[in-house]
Amino acid sequence: MDTDSGDLSEGELSPGPEQFSSKSFAVQAQKKILSKMATKTMANMLIDDTSSEIFDELFKVTKEYVKNKKEAHKVLKDLVKVAVKVGILYRNKQFSLEELEIVENFRKKLNQTCMTAVSFFEVEYTFDKNVLSGLLHECKTLLHELVQRHLTPKSHSRIDRVFNHFADVEFLTALYSLEGNYRPYLKRICEGVNKLLDERVL
């Protein structure tokens, strides 16, 4: 899934025992199928509607901020790919007990990050770029740790690209500016995040 051609690259999952594992093969087969689909199709299949709407708003604000549609598309495509891959690993019970503890820690940190992001939007003059950036970087670290033995260096690079973009303090400052052009995007993003928080998805 790390290749645009759709071929299942060797090492997409970290090498395991020499013997054949039908479960591992099934995971790789799913990855191969998903790699041939468009990003939008993957999102529709494996990501709920509210998350898809949030991703769409993130794409719009990223495109406007970087002034480059291709670069914005790359960031969001990487975001969706990472989400899908982690979802596949989780669904197929690929995580060890120790890794499941990391999953729980990641969920808690992501929940804290989302609640903080929404609070900074809803309560004027509370926004702290360093706090939000720090939380996002903590999420990135936990995600790297979670998929360390499962995904390739290319996937880890995708994780870095996604989190480094959204945790960039200049981007966050522009996004949360009361006088800026990004306020409508932030409003819709926070509405979606609030919905996921209410539904206990996050």
UniProtKB/Swiss-Prot annotation:
GO biological process: lipid transport; regulation of apoptotic process
Keywords: Cell membrane, Cytoplasm, Lipid transport, Membrane, Transport
Source organism (scientific name): Xenopus laevis
Protein family: Belongs to the TNFAIP8 family.
Function: May act as a lipid transfer protein.
Predominant subcellular localization, coarse grouping: cytoplasm
Pfam families: DUF758
Biased composition annotated in UniProt, kind: Acidic residues: 1-10
Keyword Isomerase assigned: no
Positions of the UniProt region annotated as Disordered: 1-24
Compartment list: Cytoplasm; Cell membrane
Gene from which this protein is expressed: tnfaip8l3
Name this polypeptide is given: Tumor necrosis factor alpha-induced protein 8-like protein 3
